[in-house]
Amino acid sequence: NPRLVLHYTLPGNSFVRWKSDISNASPSLGDLSAVEQIVDSLQIRRGNPNLKAYLRYHTELTYEWQKGIFYSNLWGAYDYQPNAIMDEKYQDGDKIVQTWDNQKDWQKLSGRLTLRVGPIKDMLQFSFTGGVNHYMSHGNTYSHTYTNWYCNAEASFNYKQFSLYWQMNTNWNNFWGETLSGGENIQVLV
């Protein structure tokens, strides 16, 4: 799989890095199977023996800066997958059929900013990350977009034998074809 990385160090404790790669994606044996599975009284899963492998293109750009206790990272990425194997659903009589096909394309634009301060006096550190993922699923019979904003905040305090750590995450959802999956909002205090 071809991969390209360009890294340039800038004056003032910062750098810019560009990465790009191309990779293959092949259908799974389960997706290629012509077998029909009854999920429940309303749903059927059906394989597709006509699926074809496809290419995935990914590129990202990072800018990072650090000075003393201050740190920042700005990151952006673009993913493009023409002929991606994605799900599609349709009605067949009184059943909903889920199957897979080589769809038109899948794209994702992503951006993220991380800011960190610390450690202050080797005891206290704060970090915040905010970002967005914008998904575009272009199927043979559908076209969907979905945008997911997310953030992560962390604080830690250490003094002698005592440690305190707090973390908060909002969910990071993934959108592929006609399926939205994701996590939960969490908080941790240790």
Language-model features, listed with the residues they occupy:
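A generic membrane alpha-helix/interface feature
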Residues: G30, Q37-V39, M86, G93-K95, ...
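Hydrophobic beta-strand residues in large extracellular and virion-surface proteins
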Residues: L6, V16, Y63, L113-L115, ...
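C-terminal beta-barrel architecture of Gram-negative outer-membrane proteins
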Residues: G130-S137, T145-V190
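Residue-level preference for beta-strand/loop junctions
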Residues: G12, L55, D105-Q107, T147, ...
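Short low-complexity stretches enriched in small and charged residues
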Residues: P27-D31, K121-L124, Y159
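Structural signature of Gram-negative outer-membrane beta-barrels, strongest in the C-terminal barrel
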Residues: N1-Q81, Y165-Q167, N173, V188-V190
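Outer membrane beta-barrel strand-and-loop segments of large Gram-negative receptors
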Residues: R46-N48, K52, W65, Y71-T129, ...
